[in-house]
């Protein structure tokens, strides 16, 4: 029968898992994958997979509610913030943010990489987008000083990409927005450390880096920003209010993705929450950065004070040598170390689920 065939296949394919340094979709905790595999055919006595379950069913309602409640616990999200599980990735938020938050049709953007730049270009479609600081002059290898920014008087928000996946930089101090709303794309650092949600008007994160499979984007938005007052022509599906009112069930959500995110939230809670996660991430990053700082062959590309704990780009200075390193690493079971084409060299993405052994 099917089951014995499946078990036989499993025996045959006793594959060892590689160390996957992909920037996203990225490594997920092995325990979570095993648990999902065990529940694949029959989720807790329902006789069906979560993939097959109606999003309006009692069983699924419990899954999505628990996912939200665990996320609230992890980040200590106050009651006056909504949690939304949406689709369209972080890239769709580049449009949703201005559509919903641009009241004066103006916003300030800090350009620290490809994704901040894309958000800025998208913002410019809907109103006046001002680039008030940028690190483009040095290939985005640092975070500009944001202590005294020329914040525009009429700006509805100041926008940052908090961790720059491609360039390996991170804001360790949030910008002084001079009283303006702060909007942050946290896709590649989400849940890697504790965060004071109250410092932001809106946070969003694509799930496929630190929390789950691709297809889900998590939005945390202060409820006074969730209104009917959106740019004219904003589609129903692109209004935060549509999804907040329907508790992320306005239409069929990415049900399986949310279920997987929920499992990762439980995994994080079991490991001591975000304080413990930050400590572990610091330990992993330190091993790698210390090695790069002492190495005669490799060097990191980021200004020390702005180094990300999640994405670590490094180079040898010789393209052929870089290519050889990537090739030999792959043969040794270290996958996806090739750097982004705009930086070259290598990049190790060492998200929450990357075990320390993969780095050390």
Predicted regions, residues:
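Active-site C-terminal subdomain of aminotransferase-like
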Residues: 29, 207-289, 303
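A glycine-/small-polar-enriched, mobile loop at the entrance of the PLP active site in fold-type I
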Residues: 17-68
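Conserved PLP-binding catalytic core of the aspartate aminotransferase-like
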Residues: 298-329
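PLP-dependent enzyme catalytic core of the Aspartate aminotransferase-like
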Residues: 17-18, 340, 344-360
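Active-site phosphate-binding strand-loop segment of PLP-dependent enzymes
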Residues: 24, 123, 134-190
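Conserved N-terminal alpha-helix of the aminotransferase class I/II PLP-enzyme fold
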Residues: 47-93, 100, 122
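PLP-dependent aminotransferase-like
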Residues: 91-158
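Conserved active-site segment immediately N-terminal to the catalytic lysine
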Residues: 183, 197-208, 217
């Amino acid at each position: 029968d099917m089951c014995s065939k499946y078990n036989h296949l499993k025996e045959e394919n006793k594959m060892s898992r590689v160390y996957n340094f992909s920037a996203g979709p990225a490594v997920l905790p092995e325990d979570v994958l095993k648990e999902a595999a065990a529940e694949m055919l029959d989720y807790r006595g329902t006789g069906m997979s979560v993939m097959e379950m109606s999003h309006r069913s009692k069983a699924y309602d419990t899954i999505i509610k628990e996912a939200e409640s665990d996320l609230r616990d992890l980040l200590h999200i106050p009651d006056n913030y909504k949690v939304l599980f949406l689709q369209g990735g972080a890239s769709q938020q580049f449009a949703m943010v201005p559509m919903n938050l641009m009241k004066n049709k103006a916003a300030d953007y800090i350009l620290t990489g490809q994704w901040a730049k894309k958000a800025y270009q998208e913002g410019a479609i809907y109103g006046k987008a001002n680039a008030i600081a940028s690190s483009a002059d040095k290939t985005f290898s640092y975070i500009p000083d944001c202590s005294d920014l020329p914040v525009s008087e009429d700006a509805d928000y100041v926008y940052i990409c908090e961790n720059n996946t491609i360039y390996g930089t991170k804001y360790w101090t949030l910008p002084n927005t001079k009283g303006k709303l702060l909007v942050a794309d946290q896709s590649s650092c989400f849940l890697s450390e504790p965060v004071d949600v109250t410092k932001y008007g809106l946070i969003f994160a694509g799930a496929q880096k630190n929390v789950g499979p691709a297809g889900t984007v998590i939005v945390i938005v202060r409820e006074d920003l969730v209104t009917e007052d959106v740019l004219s022509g904003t589609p129903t599906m692109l209004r935060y209010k549509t999804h907040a009112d329907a508790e992320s069930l306005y239409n069929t959500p990415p049900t399986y993705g949310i279920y997987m995110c929920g499992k990762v939230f439980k995994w994080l809670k079991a490991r001591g929450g975000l304080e413990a996660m930050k400590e572990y991430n610091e330990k992993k990053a330190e091993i790698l950065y210390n090695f790069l700082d002492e190495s005669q062959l490799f060097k990191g590309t980021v200004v020390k004070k702005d180094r990300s704990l999640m994405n670590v780009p490094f180079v040898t200075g010789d393209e052929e040598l870089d290519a050889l390193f990537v090739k030999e690493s792959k043969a040794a079971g270290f996958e996806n170390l090739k750097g982004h084409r705009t930086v070259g060299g290598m990049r190790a993405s060492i998200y929450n689920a990357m075990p320390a052994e993969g780095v050390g």
